């Protein structure tokens, strides 16, 4: 099918990686439904925007109603919305835990379930989820057990769904990212964050976008957890002495 008739749904689409994904899909002639809690309408008639919290099932209902009403189908879902807080395990609050589960797990569940329902009827589709390589290689300098707990669950769900729907034309993959240079990270933290990767630099938004686009075009790839992390998942490496992350918060 020509990409002129393909439709992508992107969550966490108002900034950072999500906004870059929207533009990448449009550059490939996809029509896009973009959602986040703060997204605003855009002039491009081939982008539908839906403001809402992915943890709310009503948001998923609205997103996929827009996709079908305006564009007739859903070919790709990118579960990009997510949150991250680096802090010691005993410092997490009940509210932190609830917020993590709501955004990272509940949001994934509602969005993916509705997407696959549509893709099943079409006989094809692709779901790709952004996770973290801290699942594979925890770091003493980045205590983030709730990220590992929730994003690790998404890695497991990716493989499970890939097998469940392999013969139904629906592929399910994930991009396991390192720390990506976005506006959420202050410039004074970049040197330390770069040191957390064996390649010695932070990832760029384009690194994740390229990985998503590869997976979207790789028709014989499903159940893949593609690491885009500058070597983090490959093993441990020496980190220069310096200031740690403290209480780092990232929300998509």
Please describe what each predicted stretch is.
Residues 88-89, 96-98, 193:
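Substrate-binding pocket helix/loop in short-chain dehydrogenase/reductase
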Residues 171, 204-228, 233:
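C-terminal substrate-recognition "lid" of short-chain dehydrogenase/reductases
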Residues 14-15:
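Conserved glycine-rich cofactor-binding loop
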Residues 5-6, 73-74, 119-132, 167-170, ...:
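Active-site loop of short-chain dehydrogenase/reductase
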């Amino acid at each position: 099918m020509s990409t002129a008739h393909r439709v992508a749904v992107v969550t966490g689409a108002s900034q950072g990686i999500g906004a870059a994904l929207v533009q990448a899909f449009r550059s490939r002639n996809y029509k896009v439904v973009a959602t986040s809690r703060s997204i605003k309408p855009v002039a491009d008639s081939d982008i539908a925007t839906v403001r809402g919290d992915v943890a709310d099932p009503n948001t998923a209902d609205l997103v996929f109603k827009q996709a079908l009403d305006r564009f007739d189908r859903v070919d790709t879902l990118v579960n990009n919305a997510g949150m991250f807080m680096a802090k010691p395990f005993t410092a997490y609050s009940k509210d932190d835990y609830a917020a993590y589960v709501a955004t990272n797990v509940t949001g994934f569940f509602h969005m993916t379930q509705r997407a696959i329902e549509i893709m099943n009827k079409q006989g094809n589709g692709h779901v790709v989820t952004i996770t973290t390589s801290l699942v594979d290689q925890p770091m003493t300098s980045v205590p983030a057990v709730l990220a590992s707990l929730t994003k690790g669950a998404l890695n497991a769900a990716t493989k499970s769904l890939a097998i469940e729907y392999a013969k139904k034309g629906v592929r399910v993959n994930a991009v396991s990212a390192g720390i990506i240079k976005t506006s959420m990270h202050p410039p004074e933290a970049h040197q330390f964050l770069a040191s957390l990767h064996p390649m010695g630099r932070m990832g760029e938004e384009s690194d994740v976008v390229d990985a998503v686009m590869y997976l979207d075009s790789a028709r014989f790839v499903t159940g893949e957890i593609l690491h885009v992390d500058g070597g983090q998942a490959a093993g441990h490496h020496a980190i220069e002495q310096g200031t740690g992350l403290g209480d780092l918060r990232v929300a998509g």
